[in-house]
Amino acid sequence: VYDEPNCFDSFMAHYGKFTNVSNYIAIVGAKNDQEKAGYYGEKLVLGCQELGLNTCWVAMSHGKTKAVIGKGQKLLIVIALGYGENQGVAHKSKDISEISRADVETDWFTKGMEAVCLAPTAVNQQKFMFELKDEMVTAKAPRGICTKIDLGIAKYHFEAGSGHKIFTK
């Protein structure tokens, strides 16, 4: 959505410390598409960053959007888009040992998890677990606010950092 400042002109947006934001990506889909929203949304985010734009995942600190939402769909998440006053601040990350398990240590799994630690999350949490077992990587997240979106973001980072796909059961 281009040139629409009202989305970030609410109390919650000021709580999120947004100023002069008038462009955003509204990710709309079925309720059960949250993980896909995170995965493909992060692919968009990194592409925008490569173009010199700043982005921010916004789960709850925005107002009403002008996104077109079809029947059976909902607004899953918003990504603020524009030129920031700075390049942002590094977020605190959990240690790799807190968000992963491996039956054998491999260089590619470690690289993937290092990329996961750099991944943003929609509500600044890392409530997911990656596991390497029998040469197969799985990842899961508990129920909670935006945990499936965060899992999708983290999965994209893992695959980009490790060069390996995550398998789902």
Per-segment meaning from a language model:
Residues 1-169:
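Acidic, surface-exposed loops and disordered segments
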